[in-house]
Structures are given as C-alpha cells and as structure tokens.
Amino acid sequence: SLSEQTLTHTESREEFFQRRENEQKTLTPKPAPLPLPPTASPVPQGENMIEFCDVTVTYGSRHILHHLDWTVRCGERWALTGPNGAGKSTLLSLICADNPQGYACPIHLFGKRRGRGESIWEIKKHIGFVSPEMFSTYRKPLPAIDIAASGLRDTIGLYVRPSQQERELCLEWMERFGAGDLATRDYLSLSDGEQRLVLLVRAFVKQPALLILDEPFHGLDDELTNRARSIIDAYMARPDRTLIMV
C-alpha cells in the first residue's frame, strides 16, 4: 500500500526542471558541425598582409602612434593588448582603411601602398571585423540574417539584397554559431548577447583572409564562447588565413 512506501528523494520545482533539462541535453545528440568553406579572397601564405613603416599618427599635439614598424604575414596570429588609450583602436582603423591619416602614412595593405588609388572596399573585402563599438552602431530594425549578410559588403544596414545563395551561406554561418533560430527575428528584439553573436557571425560570412576580432566574446555566455573559440580555431586551421585578436 502507499503507506508502506518510503520517500527516498525530494527536490524543489526549479531543481526538477533543471535536472530534466540536463537529462535532455545528455540524450539529444549535438548536430555535426558544418564544414567550413574556403577563403573567399586568399592572400598567398607568407606574403605581407600588413606593413607599417615608421608610421606616426597624431591628434593635435598628442602622438597616438609614434614611429611604428609592424609587419603581419599571411597565416600569422596576433594578439594586441594594452590599456585604453594605448592606440589599439587607431591601429585597427588604419588597417580597415577607416582612418584618413592612413593615406599619408607609409602603409601597405594586402600588397598595395595606401593612397595609390585603391578604394576602401578593395581593402575591406579581405577583412572580417567585429568590435564593441559596432554593438552601438548597428541599430537597424532588420531580420538578424540581414545584419549578418551586411558583412558581405561591409555596410551598416543592408542596401543590396543578397542572393539566395548568399542568404543560405549566412544561415549556415548562423547555424555554426548556434544562432540559426535567430535568423528571422528582428535584430533589435534580441538580447544584448544575441546581438553580439550576430555581429560576430557577420565577421565570418564572406570567409575573409584577415579576421580582426576586438573583444569577440564580450556578452556571450560560456557555452557560446566555447563554441565561438572552436569555430575560430577551425577557421584558422587554413594557412591562408590571418588573425588579429584584441
């Protein structure tokens, strides 16, 4: 009878649902990772992607960069560290062709001297970029997949409708990062962490030769951070890809 049974375990409602969730994660196999596509605009391995020769940048009387010599070769991985105001953002703006002082500096990007007639888009097509500043810049009421697709043409917002093939490519990248279910949702309705994840996806969609990731894991939980690290490591396994991490 019921009166003869012994109660062996008790748990709160929250503990019960957490246990069921953990059991479900254990029983549900993780999908196989999608294969990574080749680099879209490769640069020959070993060639200089970035070359700064005695570069100085000033704002008023303040020297932000002072006689800087720096060479980044294809296939290398760099980590830029330093306190706020050390010049990291200025350095990245020179690489991404966003700083007008770059025209007057002895800088070579992807084998070409800056200021010799190349457009900024010819430079940006090689670069996938994400930074904390982009989080405050991208305030467009668009589906998340369109925000990711804006990385194909380096725009803030989507001004050229992507082809079906491009949309499928962007969706594949969102699925790699565990963001596939966000694709059709309004970007502005997403949480801060989800928005940052979409912007990280945006950096990868054109399979760039150079990744510049400025605090890429900021706002991501542990699971998404670990997934992103794995994707970055897998992406960088190809010798024609270069990474600058800040």
Language-model features and meaning:
Residues 106-122, 188:
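ABC ATPase NBD Q-loop/coupling interface
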Residues 81-83:
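The feature captures the beta-strand-to-loop junction immediately N-terminal to the Walker
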Residues 50, 64-67:
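Conserved structural motif at the start of ABC-family nucleotide-binding domains
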Residues 222-224:
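Helix N-cap at the start of a conserved alpha-helix in ABC-type nucleotide-binding domains
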Residues 211-215:
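Catalytic Walker B motif of ABC-type/P-loop ATPase nucleotide-binding domains
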